[in-house]
Regions:
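C-terminal accessory segment of soluble enzyme catalytic cores
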Residues: 152-154, 164, 169-234
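Short, conserved beta-strand/beta-arch hydrophobic-aromatic motifs that form part
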Residues: 53-61, 70, 144-167, 171
Length: 234
């Protein structure tokens, strides 16, 4: 894929889920209009549970009011999951038409990015046939849920949402749900496997490098992005 245009990237720190969602939608419109390059957003969220487009409340192990974090229905694919501190979130805003990628090829590349990132921490991870995400044995270490949309009045097919990689996140949050709707599999993290967790921002740097390699892009930092409510903690 040599010759692809550069991809912008930004580390945003900790951002409320609703604010990050609004930012993605704005950037996706700008990308589809040709006003912005492909962009990789890297961040953490405060504790929040999210579901995909279909109702996944049957995968709650506790009543919603006992979760201890908000529950948000989104427009991505996939089932219920948790996001919180100690988890690296990556939201690529990419025009798949210009990249000449199908949706499943795109997802497979995201898995490859995660697997390569984990090798930086001496973790050998892989995929399980028929399931999305990245696994270490029978335990999921990274979830993927994406949306490919065509913003109104534009010709592009632009991605939003993305991946969540468990670095040092408190795995107790996952015990309150059937994570990703898969009852017979567990979850793990870099901390669980290595005994210690690197800073999430360090993992973000490693993932950015691997993203550039897998997608054949030069990665260019963005100094600032306007975030609604400006709730980022850097």
């Amino acid at each position: 894929m040599a010759g692809n245009p550069d991809c912008a990237y930004a580390w945003l720190g900790r951002v409320e889920y609703a604010d990050a969602w609004e930012l993605q939608k704005r950037l996706a419109r700008e990308r589809a209009e040709g006003a912005r390059p492909d962009t990789l957003l890297l961040l953490e969220h405060p504790p929040v549970y999210t579901t995909g487009k279909r109702d996944a409340t049957s995968n709650l192990r506790l009543p919603e009011q006992m979760l201890g974090a908000p529950l948000v229905q989104t427009d991505r694919g996939g089932d219920m999951t948790f996001h919180g501190p100690g988890q690296l979130i990556a939201y690529p805003i990419i025009d798949l038409r210009e990249a000449r990628l199908g949706v499943m090829d795109y997802v497979r590349r995201l898995e490859e990015v995660i697997i390569g990132t984990l090798r930086c921490y001496d973790i050998e991870a892989g995929v399980i046939c028929g399931l999305t995400g990245v696994w270490v044995g029978e335990e999921k270490i990274a979830a993927i849920g994406v949306r490919v949309g065509r913003p109104l009045g534009t010709g592009g097919w632009v991605t939003t949402h993305g991946l969540a990689l468990n670095v040092g996140v408190d795995l107790g949050w996952f015990r309150k749900i059937v994570s990703c709707g898969i009852a017979d599999k567990g979850v793990t993290s870099i901390r669980e496997l290595r005994g210690t967790a690197p800073p999430v921002e360090d993992v973000a740097r490693a993932l950015t490098g691997r993203f550039g390699e897998v997608f054949g892009r030069g990665m260019q930092p963005v100094n600032s992005l306007f975030i609604p409510s400006q709730s980022t903690v850097r």
